[in-house]
Amino acid sequence: LMSNLSVSTPAVTIDMQCASALMSIEMAYTHIASGVMNSAIAGGIESSSLQPDRIYATEDDRDGLYKVAQFTPQDRSPLAMLEGAERTIHKHNITKEELYPYIIGSHQRATKALDNSFLQSYIMPFSINGKKCVDECIRPKMNEKLLSRMKPLLGKDSITNAGNACLTHDGAAFVYISNEKGPFRIHSIMPWAGNPQFSPEGALESTKAILKRTDLTMDDMDVVEWNEAFAIIDALFDKSYPDHMGKYNMLGGALAYGHPYGCSGAILALHCMAALESCNGRYGLCAIAGAGGTGTALIMERI
């Protein structure tokens, strides 16, 4: 209602946690493909800095204030996502030190993308009180020594820390989708669901599912964008597709840029477009794992 769009423009809010923006793209795509719409703006907005405290109703057996939604009936922990990452790390026998290269590499690639303006045409300039807003958590000098000093978040023996888990950010990202020919087209998109106890596996499993459904392989992909909410997600890609790390998160990922939950899926799509243009590629794959064991994957084609 604060935009210059007509008040007669239909709108809907989607809550699929981390996968929300990519799911909004899926919904827009299916509406257009079915003829319900001719065009749509899809994506998301997240303001983590204004995340409100909420309180359960007096009739609810749950009590007190909370900030984080309850993702499964059995788990009320506000640290559910961190705990899911920790479980996934141990399930796949990954050490803290094995995660270092993925973290450092993400920051280095993000720094290179920033220095070379690879994303400049995809980022709208934004200022507050005359001060230009920039990505604040890219660390060009991220190194193993710094990572080794980071304190565990889930007890002294845990691996998950502020280095191998993304920061929460404010952000907004959108794509315009229509039934007219453009520089990119959606080849296929699909949701996925699995065990919420190991939610970071959603990016890998949704990738496997969409490749199987489309009869494509990782060899066909020129660019892969996964939301690296945790470095274990990078490790899962490396273990599953070791020969394809060169096409993975080419411009850096959420470990460097941060993860504004509601819009990260649209950020993936925009990064995928920019990366396809930079490498003159054809197919790009985006995948994101979401809270509660959800996920979404998308394959786009550069025309």
What are these regions (language model features)?
Residues 15-46, 89-119, 175-180, 260-281, ...:
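Active-site-proximal alpha-helical scaffold in enzymes
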Residues 1-37, 76-80, 141-167, 240-272, ...:
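Conserved catalytic cysteine-centered active-site region
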Residues 90, 144-201, 205, 209-213, ...:
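Condensing-enzyme catalytic core mediating Claisen C-C bond formation in acyl metabolism
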Residues 50-56, 197-199, 260-261, 295-301:
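Short acidic, glycine/serine/threonine-rich loops at helix termini
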Residues 39-87:
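Flexible glycine-/small-residue-enriched beta->alpha junction loops
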Residues 12-16, 40-46, 98-105, 123-128, ...:
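Beta-strand segments within the central parallel beta-sheet cores of soluble alpha/beta enzyme folds
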Residues 98-183, 245-246:
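N-terminal extracellular/periplasmic Venus flytrap/periplasmic-binding protein-like
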Residues 86, 187-256:
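Active-site pocket-lining segment
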